[in-house]
Amino acid sequence: MRPDLQELQSLCKEVRRDIVKMTAAAGSGHPGGSLSSVELLVSLYFAKMHHDPQRPDWADRDRFILSKGHVAPVLYSVLARSGYFPVEELLTLRKMGSRLQGHPHMLALPGLDNSSGSLGQGLSQA
């Protein structure tokens, strides 16, 4: 069942808190870009896209291509809150050995459909 507007707004607040906590704990990152993308990703992942955290490789899922990889914290938060991995893992952002690095690596984390770095890279991947 899809969340209503109030639930989506509440999720947006949780994701914003996650981003601030993650980048503060990491001592680095791009919180501004991540914060500017919250409503977009929450709307897509919780109200529009067809995906299943229990089956991250489901062939018929909708795919999300993050072109500006430096805003990975917002994507990580949305994936965790969707159930792809534990929310507690968010505080490992940019730590040695963490699956959550500054730019997403699709082989390191379930739910990622591309690895990104350079701005605009996603245009050719989509």
Show where each model-derived region lies.
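N-terminal hydrophobic or amphipathic helices/low-complexity stretches enriched
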Residues: 1-15
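Histidine-centered catalytic micro-motifs
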Residues: 31
